Amino acid sequence: MRKSDRSFYNWLMTNRNSMAANEVQQFANNAFLDSSFPKQSSDFDELSQYLEENTTYLMSMTTFDEAWSLYNAER
């Protein structure tokens, strides 16, 4: 799979860390446990809306914005 074909969720899972040293790693850990997370999506608006309306595990949407920037840098 080329990096550009990778969904956001697939990329995010590369950041899982049981010792979660930062907020993106904690986000990845929590998204892994979220069975409703839109796993195939690479659409910023769809993901943002899902996170704003359906989750309580993000302390701030800034964490998603940071993760999205890192994701795009690798695409």
Curated annotation (Swiss-Prot):
SUPFAM superfamilies: YozE-like
Pfam family, one: YozE_SAM_like
InterPro entries recorded: UPF0346 (IPR010673), YozE_SAM-like (IPR023089), YozE_SAM-like_sf (IPR036806)
Family: Belongs to the UPF0346 family.
Annotated protein name in UniProt: UPF0346 protein LEUM_0763
Native source species: Leuconostoc mesenteroides subsp. mesenteroides (strain ATCC 8293 / DSM 20343 / BCRC 11652 / CCM 1803 / JCM 6124 / NCDO 523 / NBRC 100496 / NCIMB 8023 / NCTC 12954 / NRRL B-1118 / 37Y)
